[in-house]
């Protein structure tokens, strides 16, 4: 079996030469007469340039086919092979990686499993982020959770910046919030997921994740790119961690934002996350608060859903843009809002209600023009943010 990788080069770069350099340098490392007696042995490890196409802007995309026998069925050895030291060679960007279906680690729960845990099958999920990100006590987290959970929220997560800090230690947050989740379940029959941020040193992370689950965590959050894909793979393949893992994109810009260097967002937040075991992946929405290419967003969405992974467009999601989100995503999406819920003029519970009002109006085919909206949470949100 093989792995296909697309590299994009600017007009000033000799794409043919660079593609051949990658095919040899990122596999056998050398291919000269001095090693002719080993050619048969080395041949099976060599990559092959299978095509080069020129785009309208003069850029060229070279396609290279790598033997799968060169890697260990994980993301770390894959990234080392396809881009490794070549990532320091100058202009050239990985814009597509095509892996066998069986490659890597599959989501343990994904879209279908998360919906089953929540008992919600016929609509997008609504998710919030604890805000302010830092400075809240464990009890503050529980008080906020109570407000939004009883308003109908499906999922809430720690802010990715919230580590295991003295102001609100992770197990204290979980303990306080777990009691609220049980209240909600007993009084409403609904389950709400709380994705607890897993942080720490490499030798502690899996133990800490297992302990969180043992103590009642029903979802986990992981900053995959700062802790490493290997951590995600380890958590996702651990039978003791039977809860969904929400993958955060923090640090992705350092790998992906360069126009002619690094890897495309769709490769890192789409392909790699989907083959490393994430159940849901957060990433910027093109219509949100961070600049993001709509084409890349669409690729990420499709790559994730092809592997049963929940897409979670984020950063600047607010009730007034729900029609745009659903137009692009349909119902299999998680609407993730931080300030779009927590900073609602009438409070976080109204922020949650505004999203559900938006979903109801879309279902009924009704206008979002403020002049046609009844007084309530949605109208307030649209007047506040558009």
From Swiss-Prot:
GO molecular function: 2,3-diketo-5-methylthiopentyl-1-phosphate enolase activity; magnesium ion binding; ribulose-bisphosphate carboxylase activity
EC number: 5.3.2.5
Presence of the UniProt keyword Membrane in the record: no
Pathway: Amino-acid biosynthesis; L-methionine biosynthesis via salvage pathway; L-methionine from S-methyl-5-thio-alpha-D-ribose 1-phosphate: step 3/6
CDD domains attached to this UniProt entry: RLP_DK-MTP-1-P-enolase
Keywords on record: Amino-acid biosynthesis, Isomerase, Magnesium, Metal-binding, Methionine biosynthesis
Catalytic activity: 5-methylsulfanyl-2,3-dioxopentyl phosphate = 2-hydroxy-5-methylsulfanyl-3-oxopent-1-enyl phosphate
Stored Pfam families: RuBisCO_large, RuBisCO_large_N
InterPro entries: Diketo-Methiopentyl-P_enolase, RuBisCO, RuBisCO_lsu_C, RuBisCO_lsu_C_sf, RuBisCO_lsu_fd_N, RuBisCO_lsu_N_sf
Cofactors, names only: Mg(2+)
Active-site residue numbers: 85 (proton acceptor)
Origin superkingdom: Bacteria
Cofactor binding notes: Binds 1 Mg(2+) ion per subunit.
Binding locations of substrate: 131, 157-160, 248, 316, 338-339
Protein role: Catalyzes the enolization of 2,3-diketo-5-methylthiopentyl-1-phosphate (DK-MTP-1-P) into 2-hydroxy-3-keto-5-methylthiopentenyl-1-phosphate (HK-MTPenyl-1-P).
Annotated HAMAP family: Salvage_MtnW
Homology family: Belongs to the RuBisCO large chain family. Type IV subfamily.
Assembly: Homodimer.
Protein name: 2,3-diketo-5-methylthiopentyl-1-phosphate enolase
